[in-house]
Amino acid sequence: MAKDVRVGYAPSPTGHLHIGGARTALFNYLFARHHGGKMIVRIEDTDIERNVEGGEQSQLENLQWLGIDYDESVDKDGGYGPYRQTERLDIYRKYVDELLEQGHAYKCFCTPEELEREREEQRAAGIAAPQYSGKCRRLTPEQVAELEAQGKPYTIRLKVPEGKTYEVDDLVRGKVTFESKDIGDWVIVKANGIPTYNFAVVIDDHLMEISHVFRGEEHLSNTPKQLMVYEYFGWEPPQFAHLTLIVNEQRKKLSKRDESIIQFVSQYKELGYLPEAMFNFFALLGWSPEGEEEIFSKDELIRIFDVSRLSKSPSMFDTKKLTWMNNQYIKKLDLDRLVELALPHLVKAGRLPADMSDEQRQWARDLIALYQEQMSYGAEIVPLSELFFKEEVEYEDEARQVLAEEQVPDVLSAFLAHVRDLDPFTADEIKAAIKAVQKATGQKGKKLFMPIRAAVTGQTHGPELPFAIQLLGKQKVIERLERALQEKF
């Protein structure tokens, strides 16, 4: 690449890190790391009324949790700051003044009511996309001075060049063109003195030497406005890549109001999803590697990331696939880390005390290990392991059908006799007892294992049986076997 790669991700602290923002940040990060470049996180905090307390910190913490270790931001000065837009207002003012002096921008005194009336008139005349008429563009310097002297509030608008075609050579979509006639003179500074997004982002990207901009496709229509600012200042714009929409399983654009999908990174973190699984999943949301493999480490993704493989079609956020992928990572997880992930959920659900004894902690560790293959996320340990915390066994319908089979009393009676004598009560001893029951009754396979599982767990599927029996404890297993022998199924 001709110049150093510097990419930027610019969240607003108006909320927490959304899955759409996380995906955008991730592609910026992968591109920068693939090319040995830098990633900058700039905080776009000029929408002061909508900023939420802790929003900025939450955005940064969740990026870092995902494994997006950016190079520059409010907490990592790289010499291109300030990194908050509210701390850059004097910088923007300088460039606004320059445009005013050169006649490329002007003060607009039209009230919101006048502007709305203008839009309504244009709609009534059959204009589908109303735009500003340019009324204040024609004010003389004397008229401007008089209106200012009267204390009339004003915005500042950019003069849109006439008869120009703007071309974007987009890294995802190829060549996209826009005509200046379709864009009215637009506001670069609001009446409160705060610059608008389309103006401030150009100043920031230029001064921070951003070389490539990866962002959502909803920003594509903003690009010609930004190119006008680059042109007026004689600056070279960065290369743009507009990422496809993320859609739900009904192929509709993801809406933050859609409660059928968990949409914030912090929520996945709280549920016990793994950052490396989320990183992997987001990387495949609008980008595809060569071949069929879907599980990649962060380093592998950095190495193979290729812009030419970014998708032009909407990307479906498939929660089932994310859960499957997280399970693949959990299966290979170090047990200490899995305990760290799952144990707090058992405590939070009231299944275990916060101040556990060493014996309780070891039991919990063994329980979590028992479900490592099945667990899709940390919080799932609570419903998965419910049978271990119930006083009375609850039989599923399938378990009742199994327990109604004719060989069951013989199997359970023989197993109960062995259980009473078992000491120590360990998985190995339990395995030996089941083998002895097989020999004594002649039953094997499902006819042997299913009745025992159904009697002690109330289920026909579950974790490895001897270990589950060991964790239930001798007394509870005896009680459950006795009940199954007495009950009519």
Swiss-Prot record:
Q: PROSITE patterns from the xrefs?
A: AA_TRNA_LIGASE_I
- Residue window of motif 'KMSKS' region: 253-257
The molecular function terms in GO held by this entry are:
ATP binding; glutamate-tRNA ligase activity; tRNA binding; zinc ion binding
GO CC terms, sorted: cytosol
| Catalytic reaction list | tRNA(Glu) + L-glutamate + ATP = L-glutamyl-tRNA(Glu) + AMP + diphosphate
Alphabetically, which GO biological process terms does the record hold? glutamyl-tRNA aminoacylation
Q: Name one Pfam family in it.
A: Anticodon_2
Keywords of this entry: Aminoacyl-tRNA synthetase, ATP-binding, Cytoplasm, Ligase, Nucleotide-binding, Protein biosynthesis
The residues that the entry says bind ATP are K256
Q: What class of enzyme is it?
A: ligase
Where is motif 'HIGH' region found?
11-21
Q: Where in the cell is it found?
A: Cytoplasm
Tree of life domain? Bacteria
Q: Which InterPro entries has this protein been placed in? A: aa-tRNA-synth_I_cd-bd, aa-tRNA-synth_I_codon-bd_sub2, aa-tRNA-synth_I_CS, aa_tRNA-synth_I_cd-bd_sf, Glu-tRNA-ligase_bac/mito, Glu/Gln-tRNA-synth, Glu/Gln-tRNA-synth_Ib_cat-dom, GluQ/Sye
Write the Enzyme Commission number(s) for this entry. 6.1.1.17
Reply yes or no: does the keyword Cytoplasm apply. yes
Q: Which protein family is it in?
A: Belongs to the class-I aminoacyl-tRNA synthetase family. Glutamate--tRNA ligase type 1 subfamily.
Oligomer status and interactors: Monomer.
What the protein does? Catalyzes the attachment of glutamate to tRNA(Glu) in a two-step reaction: glutamate is first activated by ATP to form Glu-AMP and then transferred to the acceptor end of tRNA(Glu).
According to UniProt, the name of this protein is: Glutamate--tRNA ligase
In which organism is this protein found? Geobacillus stearothermophilus
